[in-house]
């Protein structure tokens, strides 16, 4: 009978370089073994695997780039579980900051400007950066000072929230923009 899963398992072990080598997959002749109690000893690979099997545990290569490679005698399943748990915890603690964009034109009405500034305020309170963009069309390009006035009035309305002006008002082609970021407490 042909074992069709053997090739799949072998390919899986080759493709995943991040996975640690365990037991018979370790290719070194000699290894530095760290036992569960913390003591170290340099052993041949056969003796190290034999001691791991006697303890009912696995020989796991932790540092392959050292001569001789460093291996630990531990339960590989538990070790892998704790590694994954630690990675999930780190991922959960990361704060993802998104860049929100608020677009307007230089001939915006005061009510619309109030509405847009409330949106900017809520984005900043949520912890997101905000890119405020003013798009000029046609003859409006001759009156860029209107754009600077609008951006300054928005910054005044948002003034009660702690924010950092990440990029001052710039003109790029037909658009004027500035980027505002929330100020985080450390």
UniProtKB/Swiss-Prot annotation:
UniProt record, GO biological process: ribosome disassembly
Lineage of source species: Bacteria, Pseudomonadati, Spirochaetota, Spirochaetia, Spirochaetales
Gene assigned in the entry: infC
Protein name listed in UniProt: Translation initiation factor IF-3
Key words of the record: Cytoplasm, Initiation factor, Protein biosynthesis
Localization per Swiss-Prot or TrEMBL: Cytoplasm
Species name: Borreliella afzelii (strain PKo) (Borrelia afzelii)
Function field: IF-3 binds to the 30S ribosomal subunit and shifts the equilibrium between 70S ribosomes and their 50S and 30S subunits in favor of the free subunits, thus enhancing the availability of 30S subunits on which protein synthesis initiation begins.
Single GO cellular component term: membrane
Molecular function GO labels: ribosome binding; translation initiation factor activity
Quaternary structure, from the entry: Monomer.
């Amino acid at each position: 009978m042909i074992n069709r899963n053997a090739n799949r398992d072998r390919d899986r072990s080759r493709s995943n370089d991040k996975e640690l080598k365990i037991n018979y997959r370790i290719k070194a002749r000699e290894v530095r073994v760290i036992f569960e109690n913390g003591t170290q000893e340099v052993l041949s690979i056969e003796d190290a695997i034999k001691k791991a099997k006697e303890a009912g545990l696995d020989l796991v290569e932790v540092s392959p780039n050292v001569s001789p490679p460093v291996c630990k005698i531990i339960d590989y399943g538990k070790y892998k579980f704790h590694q994954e748990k630690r990675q999930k915890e780190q991922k959960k603690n990361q704060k993802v900051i998104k860049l929100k964009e608020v677009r307007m034109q230089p001939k915006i009405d005061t009510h619309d400007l109030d509405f847009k500034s409330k949106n900017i305020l809520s984005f900043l309170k949520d912890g997101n950066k905000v890119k405020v963009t003013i798009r000029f069309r046609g003859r409006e390009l001759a009156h860029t000072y209107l754009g600077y006035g609008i951006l300054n009035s928005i910054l005044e309305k948002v003034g009660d929230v702690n924010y950092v002006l990440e990029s001052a008002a710039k003109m790029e082609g037909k658009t004027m923009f500035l980027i505002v970021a929330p100020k985080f407490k450390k």
